[in-house]
A protein has these predicted regions:
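Soluble or luminal CAZymes and related metallo-dependent hydrolases
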Residues: 3, 7, 46, 92
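Short, hydrophobic secondary-structure boundary micro-motifs
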Residues: 24, 34-35, 64-67
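A short gly/proline-enriched turn/hairpin at secondary-structure junctions
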Residues: 32-42, 57-59
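A general secondary-structure boundary signal
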Residues: 23-27, 33, 84, 98-100
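Short acidic-aromatic low-complexity motifs
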Residues: 1-30
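A beta-strand edge to alpha-helix "cap/lid" segment located at domain peripheries
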Residues: 48-124
């Protein structure tokens, strides 16, 4: 049976490869993906459809699913692996922060935020 480190690796591979099967294999039944661009959090049963919406949305903004993850911080405490990272999608202005939590059953939470310097400047 895979451990939390292997499940976390499988999860990110699923995103890099846009492979819904790998995503579904790596998450818990009570998985939640919280994206502020969505009307409500996404559960495991909706994850494949969300991935297709994400790909279409980001491609319309110029991205091609090539990622840069930087400023990664990892904590493994009490059986929960927590990853924080800055993400950017090449070819677009999309960037933000991600928080991913994984236990030995799988990834159970991902929460992302978006950063937009222009929008932030215009709202001040």
């Amino acid at each position: 049976m895979p451990n939390r480190f292997e499940l976390r690796d499988l999860y990110i591979q699923g995103w890099y490869e846009l492979d819904a099967g790998k995503l579904l294999e790596s998450v818990t039944d009570d998985f939640v993906f919280d994206d502020p661009a969505e009307p409500c959090p996404v559960g495991k049963t909706e994850l494949g459809a969300y991935m297709r919406r994400w790909d279409a949305r980001t491609r319309s903004l110029g991205a091609d699913n090539r990622w840069i993850l930087t400023d990664e911080v990892r904590q493994d405490r009490d059986g929960i692996l927590t990853d924080w990272e800055w993400w950017e999608l090449l070819g677009s202005s999309l960037k933000g922060m991600g928080l991913i939590k994984t236990n030995d059953r799988g990834v159970f939470l991902e929460r992302i935020t978006y950063f937009d310097r222009v929008a932030n400047r215009e709202s001040i």
